[in-house]
């Protein structure tokens, strides 16, 4: 579902392009036009292309109100393609690609009587999210290093090694060499991430072990953040374009890049 932040649902091609572009710009910081739409006979659409390349997304977007009351058929679209190369999500660069075929879209309104676009069904499609292990390692150094410096701790070295534990599970070993004044410590962090049968992504294990007083201090300091992370989860159904679509399968693969692939559709 995509909130359009307007009272009336678009009734022709130009209005729909404008509404979609304005709506997506509320969630993605990016200059220029995001949406391209091709249609020979509206409301039958040949292609909706969404270009998020180089955009910036808040890691905690505001929750979206569901549609309430009456809904109806808005249009049908042969293909919806989304490209998100070097898309920054919470400061972490990712590559995102999504393809949907034979999509049926409905109109509706939320509790504020603003129009919403509901992607009701798709015959088939897939979403692929990728990130290189090296880029993830650099992001951890940048983000965690900034927080560590608040405690007077410098990260001298950090190494990330990820591996798949199965089709829906992956593990990460993070080895850190830290320094505070003249004290040094080696800190090992283990993270396990699992995806449930309900397509909910959750950190199931998060452990820290450090040597010496500095290592113990770091692990103790991290415990509240670890506990908050263990309590959080992310449903793939909360992704606006997938909230109403039938999800079929998902798997993770790890090599030089970490790839998450979601298969969906009624086919």
Q: What does each model-found stretch correspond to?
A:
Residues 1-267:
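Extracellular/lumenal and peripheral-membrane lipid-interaction modules
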